[in-house]
Amino acid sequence: MESTMRSPLPYGNACATCARAKCRCVPRNGGRGRCERCHHLNKECRAPQGRRKIQPKTLSRSVQLERKMDGLMSLLTSFGGRTDLPTPVQRQSEVQGMWRTEVESGTEDEETSASEEEYLRAFRTQRLQFLPLIHIPATTTVGDLKLQSPFLWQCISAVESKNTARQATLCVKIRELAGKRLLVDCDKSLDLLQGVLVYLAWITLHSQPHKSSLCMYSQMAIGLVFELGLNKPAPPDLSMTVSNSNAVGHMPGLEASISTRRTMHERRAVLSCFVLTSIIAQFLGRMGPLQWTSHMKQCLDILAESEESPGDRVLVQLTRTRLLVDQISHGPWSEGLYGLNSAQTLATFHLKALQSQLETIRAEIPIQLADNKPILFHLFDTELSLYEAALVKPLADEDFSSQRLDHLYACLRVVKQFFDLFFTIPPAGYTSLALPYIAQVSHCLVILFRLSTLDYPGWDKSTVKNTADILCIAEQISTRMAQVGDAIGMRSEGAYGDPFSKWGMMMQKLRSEWAIRLPDCSEVVVDRSSAESSCPSIEMGDLDCFVNWSELGWVMEGAGAGGFIQ
């Protein structure tokens, strides 16, 4: 009876044998020795290895919210009703700004506020004159730009830096930041799009280190245009921006990044994206440009009447010329232009229609922009694209064509006009040249080399040399590029030298290649070993297509392909 009055041990204190059998553990003999069950079964009564931990009781959600509210009320009471504190929206924007400008942490101390203001002034007054892809009012300060467009400011800093080592560091950080925001955080903003456009226009070709990134960053810009909806009319409200799957509730948390009111900044961005991707597509030959839409035509018409920025009308003319070039390049006569295959010539009615469009563009240029160099460069390049169809490899049974001969001389005339204008730019001005003009220089050099080596009845190659000697032009470009660094005060530090000096060395290498292949150049002495030693292992990224002339089959054939387009 005594054993039946004993109570079992409390939960968690049973011996290991009873705990394993999930039985009550009743002690015997005052708690000493074996328990009742182990005694009857003649088993070893082992003490438990460790007591089971009891999880603390969690507070209910209502209690947690009450404690948070009590903490907020006590915090507000301690500030005594101050009104000078930032609002939650202001605080959020400040935190975003701190996160977005984290790339500045390593380089902010190196630049003074005066030099930063000079960067902004130079970018606004010099670079945007050649490619007005954005409008920065004169009243905008560096602080304003850092707060409103932090990624754009980082790109401007990299472009305008006169220290090659710091420029290289900024370029790498910009790529890292762009990858994080675009691919990791899936961020979509006008600031990102404008920064990517600046990257494409200047950083890829003028800054260090050179990387083959034109194609990938072009697709980034096109993707941002799609995500922001800039190629389509702005919806009247955000409820119309969701996809069908989101409309039925499959993705209820998805927020649209599309604005309901189209701004002038957005119109400039989408047109600039079209201009840049159109030129890059022609330059590389392995991608397509941003597709033209009716809404982009509306943006073009609005900018044509804009009085907000003088650059708007320049951008309008650049866009119109690229539209015509795209129309020319999509014609059947262009199929053999950059290859060794034969192709049909440009029909007369096609030529007259395209010539009429080009003359319309010329006639609609405002009087004050008649001598604008960026517009003239694009007009020359458009005219060259129109007449270069005469350089396609003739069909085997094709008779002599006086029209083809006229087009060849028209190409020669346009190339001469282009370089005559190009050499009016002072050495310091070449640093402001954007990607479109570098591509146009390469285009003219390709055409001039083909004109200098073309065999066609009635075509006089000595006239080409007397009109525009490609060796003299290459020498002049090389000399001027070598003067740019000193003209702008560029400091070459670290492993990266002056990018413009590399341009000059690259032109010297090209000149040596041309001198070997050009006829009647026996008087030109070419030392290939010295040319290669002066240009050791130049890594030019997408500019490798400038250098790899010896690998192009059309050079050996004397006609056919289009040199820089690879």
Swiss-Prot record:
Source species, domain of life: Eukaryota
GO molecular function ontology, one term from the record: zinc ion binding
Keywords for this protein: DNA-binding, Nucleus, Transcription, Transcription regulation
InterPro entries for this protein: prtT, Zn2-C6_fun-type_DNA-bd_sf, Zn2Cys6_DnaBD
Gene ablation phenotype (knockout): Does not affect the production of oxopyrrolidines A and B.
Gene Ontology annotations for the cellular component aspect, listed alphabetically: nucleus
Function noted in UniProt: Transcription factor; part of the gene cluster that mediates the biosynthesis of oxopyrrolidines, polyketide-amino acid hybrid compounds with feature structures of tetramic acid.
Transmembrane segments: none
Main location: nucleus
Location(s), subcellular: Nucleus
Protein name per UniProt: Transcription factor opdL
Organism: Penicillium oxalicum (strain 114-2 / CGMCC 5302) (Penicillium decumbens)
Binding region for DNA: 15-45
